[in-house]
Amino acid sequence: MQPRSKHTGMSENGNDKRDGDDGQTGVVIKTRPKTKKPSMYKVLMLNDDYTPMEFVVHVLERFFNKSREDATRVMLHVHTRGVGICGVYTYEVAETKVTQVMDLARQNQHPLQCTIEKE
């Protein structure tokens, strides 16, 4: 007669079964991290009494890819209202455009100013 064995939670092969693992495999579902859209920034041009209107139109055409008509419209808006939107971009692009405008204005000895504002 064999002695009665106590249940130890061990399977025949010695693996511990007490943790609820029945040896079956499961499927791991990978979720894609949600990507957040970057914040957008307006590049604003400020009016001054010294920068020639034609220079402002040139800047808008060159750095903001405006047509002559659109550039003239923005320039007149800046001239009459004191400030106008040149375009809306991600921060890095907006910052680059402001730097390009300010550098060209300085090279041509114009006090033209541009700033960035979060949309």
Swiss-Prot record:
GO terms for biological process: protein catabolic process; proteolysis. Residues 1-34 are annotated as: Disordered. Pfam families: ClpS. Involved in the modulation of the specificity of the ClpAP-mediated ATP-dependent protein degradation. HAMAP family: ClpS (MF_00302). Binds to the N-terminal domain of the chaperone ClpA. This is ATP-dependent Clp protease adapter protein ClpS. The lineage of its organism: Bacteria, Pseudomonadati, Pseudomonadota, Alphaproteobacteria, Rhodospirillales. The gene is clpS.
